[in-house]
From Swiss-Prot:
A GO cellular component annotation in the UniProt record: phycobilisome
Species of the source: Pyropia haitanensis (Red seaweed)
Modifications the protein undergoes after translation, according to the UniProt entry: Contains one covalently linked phycocyanobilin chromophore.
PANTHER family with a match to the protein in the record: C-PHYCOCYANIN ALPHA SUBUNIT, PHYCOBILISOME 32.1 KDA LINKER POLYPEPTIDE, PHYCOCYANIN-ASSOCIATED, ROD 2-RELATED
Residues bound to (2R,3E)-phycocyanobilin: 84
GO BP terms: photosynthesis
The organism's taxonomic lineage, starting at the top: Eukaryota, Rhodophyta, Bangiophyceae, Bangiales, Bangiaceae
Subunit structure: Heterodimer of an alpha and a beta subunit, which further assembles into trimers and the trimers into hexamers. The basic functional unit of phycobiliproteins is a ring-shaped hexamer formed from two back-to-back trimers contacting via the alpha chain subunits. The trimers are composed of alpha/beta subunit heterodimers arranged around a three-fold axis of symmetry. The phycoerythrins also contain a gamma subunit which is located in the center of the hexamer.
Name of the featured protein: C-phycocyanin alpha chain
Alphabetical list of SUPFAM superfamilies matching this protein: Globin-like
Function per UniProt: Light-harvesting photosynthetic bile pigment-protein from the phycobiliprotein complex (phycobilisome, PBS). Phycocyanin is the major phycobiliprotein in the PBS rod.
Entry keyword Membrane: yes
Amino acid sequence: MKTPITEAIASADSQGRFLSNGELQAINGRYQRAAASLGAARSLTNNAQRLITGAAQSVYTKFPYVTQMPGPTYASSAIGKAKCARDIGYYLRMVTYCLVVGATGPMDEYLVAGLEEINRSFELSPSWYVEALQYIKGSHGLSGQIGNEANVYLDYAINTLS
């Protein structure tokens, strides 16, 4: 999995050299942001159920047909609602994984690669998940550097789905 740190090391190693001052500064910057990133990951994890439930409700409010249409891809039944919450939780987990590693690698490798095909195969609308992630971004209650770190990866997921 690529992170700014592993990329700097791979570049230096492939050239048979030590890390440059610029690379060391970039790595140091990552370590300085790491505490905020871990704080954001911890908070999102601790509040996951509340955020997922609220995000699902936001989807149902914005797209009421989701709860009215029958079928396995809609939330008209308890099973459908559970699937919706599960999927929102998956996106939120990916955001927390990105926060831990300090890069979009987890999302790129585990989510983005097959996202379009999955959504098309299961007739899932990306706009549902955009709404859910926007809700989470607006409701996570994080501020300062911790909030900024969380929002970087929430925005990345939103932009990927848009």
